[in-house]
């Protein structure tokens, strides 16, 4: 299936891996350099819907739904970042991609790092992108910085014989959906745009598709040894730090991450937000193109 967007056709498909079928959206010529894009926890390939047409000029851009999210197969029990990286290596083989470039956002940057470290012959260049909190090297500090984003999803109750814990989990999901249904962009706007409603709709759908996988994925992130993994990356690497005023107290973290990867480069996007892929796609694409297309 394909949908026309800005005169560029976005195609949708599935690739079979051991877990089942992985869903993806792609744009660009089949013989263009492949570029895989991985999303954050709770999202799907839809977060790259504005970037794909822009990337299609230079790449075969492939935005995937991670296991348990979007339209991909369910996540395996007790996943690890390494196991998810293995699934991505399988997808690369299934699609017969030759050393695709890898772009990972937030959770995606952890999987991208593990993929590059564990399967160096499978990948081309690597871009690790995320807000400052997601690039912190110290595991305890990073996990504490993740708490404002993750705590609301973790249950504060025990399993019960009557199944009431399922209702409590569903109630947490409903509360999260309420926030995505009425984001600040809608509540505080002077005027409402069709794109604001479309953005809210995408966030709601993404959450409903992936709500059961968010906690297992965060647990995998909490256990992930980022410094150990990035030290093994051999690929040419860019760390793209999305700098926000709310996280200024952490100080720049991307350069510290770069120091562990031989030859890695650091770039910052100032005044960023978590939805920069959707609200400022041209700037993200410019950074990607500047790094990957450099001769």
Residues covered by each model-derived region:
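Hydrolases whose catalytic domains are alpha/beta-hydrolase-1, hotdog thioesterase
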Residues: 111-115
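Alpha/beta-hydrolase fold catalytic core
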Residues: 1-35, 57-59, 93, 97, ...
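Catalytic active-site module of serine/aspartate enzymes centered on a nucleophile-bearing elbow/loop
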Residues: 262-295
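Conserved alpha/beta-hydrolase catalytic His-Asp/Glu region
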Residues: 137, 160-232
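Active-site loop/oxyanion-hole signature of alpha/beta-hydrolase fold enzymes
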Residues: 62-107, 118, 277-278, 286
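Conserved HGGG/HGGXW glycine-rich cap/lid loop of the alpha/beta-hydrolase fold
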Residues: 18-74
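Conserved loop-alpha-helix segment in the C-terminal half of the alpha/beta-hydrolase fold
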Residues: 234-272
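Flexible "cap/lid" loop of the alpha/beta hydrolase fold
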Residues: 117, 124-168
